[in-house]
Amino acid sequence: MGNRALRYRIYPNTAQMEQILKTVGSCRFVYNDALTAKESAYKESKTVLTAHDLIRRLPELKKQYPWLKEADSIALQQSLRHLGTAYANFFNPKLHAKRPKYKTKRKSRWSYTTVMTNNNIRIGENHIILPKLGRVKAVISREIPEGWNLKSTTVCVERDYSVYVSCLFEYADISVSYIPDPALSIGLDYKSDGLYVDSSGRCCGSPKYFRKAQKRLTKAQRGLRHKKYGSRNYRKQNQRVARIHRHTANQRRDFLHKESVMIAKSYDIVCIENLDMTAIAKRDSGLGKASLDNGWGMFVSFLEYKLRDRGKLLIRTDRYFASSQTCSCCMNINPKVKDLKVRKWTCPTCGAVHDRDINAATNIKREGLRILSAIELDKVS
C-alpha cells in the first residue's frame, strides 16, 4: 500500500474560521500539557507514558477545562500521537531529531489532524465536509483517482490566515512493468548557486525567488517593526509579511515540480549524491542562503516519488564519493581540486580539461550505474 497527500485551498466562513483556530489552540494546549506530564512522570518515577496513556487522560482534562469539548476530539488525540512520534524520532539515532519542545502560538505551525471515521470527512465538487466545521467551500484543484481511500486530513492555517487542507489517501501499489534503460540515465551534481548541473552539461539555475522578494520583504518587515505588537495594524502588517513568504514558497514549489517532472519523463535512471544539506547550509562558504533558497531537498523528494510512480530509479551515491576530484576520463583522483574555488582543472595524468560540475555529474552517473549493477548481481546470486 502507498500513501499520497493532495492539498486543497478552503474558504471557511467567520464561524468556521473561529472553530478552526479554537481547535488549533486546543491541540496546542493538550500537546503542551502532555509534554509536561510525560517529563514529570519520568523525572519522579522513571515511568514512560505512552501515547495511549496520554489519551486516557483526556476525559479528566476536559472536566478540568470544559472549553476543550468544543474542539474535535479526534484532533486532540492525534496531537498526543504526534507527541509520541516526536519522542520516538528523538530516540532514533538514525534520524538525528531534536528533543520535543513546547508549542507556542507565535512560532509553532497552526494546524491539526483529524482521522476518517464513519465517513465523517467527505470531498465534493466544490466543498469539503469536516468534523465540527460541516460543509466548507473549497477549490478541488485535482480529482481523486479511483481506488484512493481517504485516511486523514490536516487543516493548516497560514500566517496570512489562508487555510489549506491536506488530504492523505491510501492506495494499492500497482507494479509497473517497466524495465529502466541504462542508456537513458543521467547524473546530477548539486550546485549551491543554482540547482544542479547534469552529466550532459546542462546547467539548471535557481530562479532565486527569495532574493527577488527580499526588497519587498525587508520593507514589509520594517513596517511591522514600527507597529505595536497585538494591535490591529500589527496583525494586518504581519499578514502582508506572511503573504510574501507564502508567494515565494509557492513559486519555488511550482518551479521544482516542473523541473522534477521534466527529468522523470526524460530519463529512466537518475543518479545523485546523498548530501547533508544542513551541513552545507551551515558551511562557512557564504552560500548558506543560496543553498536554502534553491530547495534541493524538496527537489529530490519530488523527483523520487515521480520516478517511483513511473517504475524508474533514483540512485544515491555515497556522500564521501570523490566525484569532483576524480577525472572522468582516466579515473585518477586529484586532491588539489578539493577546494571549491577551483572551477576548471586539467588532469595531471591524461591531460583532460574538466569543468568541475560537469565532471562531477559524469562521475556520479558512472558510480550510480555501478551501484545498480552490484544490486542486480546480488539479486541474481
Label the model's feature ranges:
Residues 1-381:
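Nucleic-acid substrate recognition interfaces
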